[in-house]
């Protein structure tokens, strides 16, 4: 990656391109390390509106969340939780220390954290999980737009557990949070 006189160029094993920039932007490489997330979080935290254009395309936003006090072998460190939106379908968590440097990335299947601080992974995961549950509950409330009269799903392939068969061409009528009727397509009155 290079940026010279307002022109950014990139080239890696999967992509190459260039663009003329008229403002701040961050190149987030396809092969980004977890430490690069920390650099991005810091750049976003210092950007106007905590947003930056991403190269080769897109935009990222950061939300600065919880501070957590950690201790390992008598040493204490305060770390801060950052959530970056715009890299995928869900926000990505990263932890920075008090100086704004990368401290860690923790996940249930992969964690990158300084040697000696491995014991903090569970604490940080718990904070992230609490945030994730709260976010999903908020989304469920904000995004749930159930029609007052219900809705029908037609052309359903339904598994009938009583007879252990699948049935094609079925309609499922949902009113509120309850399945009101199930029948073959065209057999349920959808007008009421």
Residue spans for each PLM region:
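Solvent-exposed helix/loop surface patches that form functional interfaces
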Residues: 1-78, 103-106, 126-130
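Short, small/polar residue-rich loop motifs at catalytic or cofactor-binding pockets
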Residues: 88-90, 145-147, 165-168
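Extracellular/periplasmic ectodomains of large secreted or surface enzymes and adhesion receptors
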Residues: 114-155, 188
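Histidine-rich, glycine-flanked metal-binding segment
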Residues: 163-192
